[in-house]
Structures are given as C-alpha cells and as structure tokens.
Amino acid sequence: MKQSVKFKALYWDIAADLLFPPNFDETKKYPVIISTHPIGSCKEQTSGNVYGQAFADAGFVVLVPDASFQGESGGEPRYIEDPSFRVEDYSYACDYLVTLPFVDEKRIGVLGICGAGGYSINATMKERRIKAVATITGANYGRVMREFGDPIANLEAIAEQRTAEARGAALRVDQGLYPTVEAAKADNANIDLLEATKYYRTSRGEKPNGVNKTLFSHNATALTWDAYNLAEKLLTQPLLVIVGGIPGGFGAYRDGFEIVRRAASTKKELFVIENWSHYDLYDKPEPVKQALDKLIPFYKENL
C-alpha cells in the first residue's frame, strides 16, 4: 500500500510516497526508514521502486521523498542541488514522521543512495532522531564536484553567472548526463557516466522527474562542502556502507572506505559487493539482493 503525502519544508512542501508493510495496522507503532534518492533522481526510481518497496515488504513503514526544488516537491527556482537544503530535508522528514500515530519516533533510520549517501551521513550527524544510517554507493558530493574540473575556475564562473542572472539573464540549467547511451560511448565516458546514462536515459530506469538537471548558479555550496566533516566526532549512530566492487569515476568505492574509517560509530561496517558496479546496485537483481540481505537485518537490529 502506498500513499502520496506532502509535508512542510522552509517555505514550500516536500512531496513523498509513504509505503506501508503488509497487513498494516494503524493502531500499532512501526519503525520507519527514510529512503532518499540519488542526485538528479526522483522518488519513483531506485529509492522508491527498489529499496523502498523492499523495506515495506520486510515490515517497515517507508518514507520516500523528492528532494526540495526537485521532482514533485516545491521550491523555486527549480533544480537547485544544494547540500544545505538536501541535508535539512531529513529534519523536515523527521518533523513530519513524529506527527504520525503509527510511527515509533525512537526507531527512525535512513538510507541514502549515491549522492544521498553523503547527505544521509551528514544529516545523521546533526539529526539525533535518526538512529541508524545506511548507504548504497554513497558519494561525497562536495568531493565529486571539486574533482570534476577546476574548482576555483568553477567558483569564478558561478559568480559571473549569478551576476548575470541578477541583472536579468536567463537561468543556466545544466544537464548532468549524455542524452543517449550512444553519445556517452562516442565520448568515451567513464564507467559511472556511461552506466548512469544507461539507467536514466533508457526504459530501464527512466522516469519523468528523474531529469538530472542542476541550476549552475547555485553550485557554489557543493564545491565548498564536505559530507564527512566532523564524522570523527559526531557520527555515532550505527552505520552500514555498501559499495560495488568495481570502482567508478564518481568515487563511491573509496568514499565508502573513508567514511567507515573516520566515523565515530562503534557499530560500523563496510560491505563490498564484488564484481558489480555503482549503477548495478540501483536495480540489478543479484547485487540488490546482496545489499538487502545486509540492509534489512541491519535496520531490524538497530531500530
């Protein structure tokens, strides 16, 4: 069973799907998992139709939101990818969940996929209502942004674009992926960009709201941000990090090792799914099964 819901953010609403377990009883209290989508994705893709549904089938209530400024969520201008807003979305989700009579507010966990893995970890440090965090191919978006191109040159370009927009120029909306798989292959794209195109630009994973667009003039925060800052002091909740064993250009593989090494959590684990890549873990049955075989016991033990 699924219900479309909205809850308040700062000055706009966040849209989400609320997934219920079989034989749901509204008089009981349930543990909840907030399942959050990759950068450029939406709630109808892997966070919802793969992992979210599996968690609901396993007995959890699951909240699958669209990020602020994206998908069916509110916020203007559209396509802002700003870590400060993305991280705060988790607190707004907790604010909503604690108002629901069937939610056990002491048993809230989060899952973050790809860039939302970094967001989930950062949010868990400050949001103590989150009791356990897991990531699937989690990436530190700030590091990714700094490694793709010259960060100083990009910050200068952002400053120029903001000035132009303040004076009336059109907004610059960047497309994060190739339009087709053939275009990605022709450009010799790295494995992550090629496989992202295969997922987002074909019937395999394509959804109307999974547009992979960003508003260029609002990218400066990401360039100066570190998802794992203060993890040695503040990340104390149970942590499960799952990565594919085939490293790719987005760096989730090495980020996984880094955050498990740095986290203050006494209960923490890195699980490498050998012979599978970043995007295989989005929806391929075998690696997804391996991931769920770790995730579901992790949440049942720690929530």
Predicted regions and their residues:
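Conserved alpha/beta-hydrolase
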Residues: A54-G74
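Catalytic histidine-centered segment of alpha/beta-hydrolase-like enzymes
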Residues: W276-V288
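Short beta-strand/loop motif that positions the catalytic acidic residue
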Residues: L234, V241-V243
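Conserved alpha/beta-hydrolase "acid-adjacent" motif
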Residues: G248-G256
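Alpha/beta-hydrolase-fold enzymes
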Residues: I121-T202
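Alpha/beta-hydrolase active-site loop
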Residues: I80-P101
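N-terminal cap/lid segment of alpha/beta-hydrolase-fold proteins
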Residues: M1-K28
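The serine-hydrolase catalytic nucleophile loop
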Residues: G40-Q53, A67
